[in-house]
Amino acid sequence: MKNKYYPLRSSMDELSTKNDNEIDLEKGPLPEYNSEDGSTLPPYSENLNLKDPKQMGANNPNLFNTDESTTPPDYGEDSLSTTHRENHSSGTADNSCASTLKKAILSFIPIFVLNVSAVCYLTYKDALFKDYGKDEWVYFGMWCASCLMILISLWCFYETWIKAVKVTAVFLAQCIKVTAVFLPQCIKVTAVFLAKCVKVTAVFLAKCIKVTAVFLAQCVKVTAISLAKCVKVISIGLFNIRREMMIIIWILWLIICCILFGCVKDGRLNFNKALICSTCTISAVLFLIVSSVCIPIWTLWRALSGMLQVLGIHGIIAVLVNGSMSLFGKHFGWRGYEIEGFVLFFTSSALFLYEMERPGVLKRMRNTTGNVIGYICGVIGDAFRRIENAFRGANDNNNIPLGEMDVEGEV
């Protein structure tokens, strides 16, 4: 049995022949066809629409049963085309109606949601139209036109926005799923991390407090030692400095205080009573420090005795000033504080200058004051004793009998 090849030609092949054998862009150039040996298939033979079942059977004998005992069904061209057309037309009509209805519903849903949201918002804001006039109808028409344009756009670009909605929904679902899985892990990791942080922070704070306490103790110790050394060095320096320099420093301080009191007296500066008292206190303290360094006073007892001595002198002056003001019947106001300040300041200045010229005069003054007070008290005591003896002698003379007086007179 010889293999016969029946060339299959369709309307597409004829159209290709008429168009000068145009090349299919998907398949590429046509392969060479050798009709003698039949080894090469005709061009694009697998994509031919074979409508004749007889030719299909001739090319492939196994496609249909050619047994003589069995009568093959009659696949006529009319019967095949009629059946295929009926099935295809009925399925296409049903699918097109369903897809059109689905497309219309899905395109109308966004417009419906938009209008419902707008009505709810306007109702909440109490901005719905109450009286439909010209402007209201214009606004309503523009709104309807906008909704119609949106509906047409959704209808025309149905596939695009449906795909976008599907992709967005899938993405949101994945995000929610990932978030639901990831959040417990994050919470667990965060809780563990916070617990570790709290533990580490507590340990670190305890160590910091301990180190800070030790450091502060060392700082206080070093500061106390440094201050003691500074005071000692300053005291030795002041003790070794020339006496003229100390006098110049005190004179400068005296000039500053005099200028200050002069400004207060003139009225250019409105200082209160506390300023004068503080100035006097500063002068007294400065006098005490300088005099203590120059004497010098190195022990606490001598420092306290010198301070009490200066304060005692100031107290005596204050009592005398207050007593004199009270005797003259004047109120102790601004004038009294001013007088007291001047007296205290100049007293401190005089004592300082006197101490600088004659070192140890305060100590001798204390002894001299005690001796003078003792001498005054002794003189007063002697005077009282003499007065007492005089009164006692007068009383003895009054107690003599009259007879003895006559005898003494005769003798």
UniProtKB/Swiss-Prot annotation:
Stretch list, region Disordered: 1-95
Name of the protein: Meiotic driver wtf33
| Assembly and binders | Homomer. Forms protein aggregates. The two isoforms can interact with each other and with themselves. High sequence similarity is required for their interaction.
Per the record, the GO terms for biological process are:
meiotic drive
Report the function annotation for this chain. Answer: Promotes unequal transmission of alleles from the parental zygote to progeny spores by acting as poison/antidote system where the poison and antidote proteins are produced from the same locus; the poison component is trans-acting and targets all spores within an ascus whereas the antidote component is spore-specific, leading to poisoning of all progeny that do not inherit the allele.
Bias-annotated ranges (Basic and acidic residues)? 11-29
GO cellular component assignments: ascus epiplasm; cytoplasm; endoplasmic reticulum membrane; vacuolar membrane
Domain of life, per UniProt, equals: Eukaryota
**Natural source organism:** Schizosaccharomyces kambucha
